[in-house]
């Protein structure tokens, strides 16, 4: 089981990958659904990984805002007190999350040396 679970919309997989690389360079183990095939057991595997993780980073953008999967993962993470919201693009958060403090990485270029990180 990983230290950190990253929730994201599949079209923003590159952002999840870049963040996972930085976290791993800093000694964390990271899990996100790269390579996981949808189908039987998909939802159970996602839930298992969220429950096992110490923290869940949710990458918010317009696409993830409208994703039932991302919203459900975020709700579970929040209920488990593991939720870390991160903006990667300008978007309004879903109503359930608008009061949460959110880390702003909208200007981050993916570099581990970026001042925006």
Task: Please report, for each region that a protein language model flagged, where it lies by residue.
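A short, gly/pro- and small-residue-rich
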Residues: 69-84
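Short low-complexity, flexible loop/linker segments enriched in glycine and/or proline
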Residues: 45-48, 73-74, 100-101
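Glycine-rich, Arg-bearing micro-motifs that act as flexible, cationic patches
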Residues: 66
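Conserved N-terminal substructure of TIR/SEFIR domains
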Residues: 1-58, 63, 78-82, 89-91
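Short amphipathic alpha-helical segments
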Residues: 17-20, 69-72, 97-99
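Conserved beta-strand scaffold positions in the cores of enzyme catalytic domains, especially
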Residues: 83-85, 102-104
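Glycine-rich, charge-decorated loop segments at or immediately adjacent to ligand/cofactor-binding or catalytic sites
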Residues: 91-102
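C-terminal helix of von Willebrand factor
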Residues: 108-117
């Amino acid at each position: 089981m990983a230290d950190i679970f990253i929730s994201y919309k599949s079209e923003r997989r590159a952002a999840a990958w870049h963040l996972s690389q930085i976290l791993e360079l800093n000694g964390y183990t990271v899990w996100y659904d790269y390579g996981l095939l949808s189908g039987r057991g998909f939802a159970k595997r996602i839930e298992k990984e969220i429950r096992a993780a110490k923290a869940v980073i949710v990458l918010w953008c317009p696409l993830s805002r409208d994703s039932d999967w991302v919203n459900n993962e975020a709700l579970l993470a929040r209920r488990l007190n593991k939720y870390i919201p991160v903006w990667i693009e300008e978007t309004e958060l879903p109503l359930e999350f608008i009061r949460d403090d959110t880390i702003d990485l909208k200007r981050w270029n993916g570099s581990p040396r970026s001042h925006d990180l």
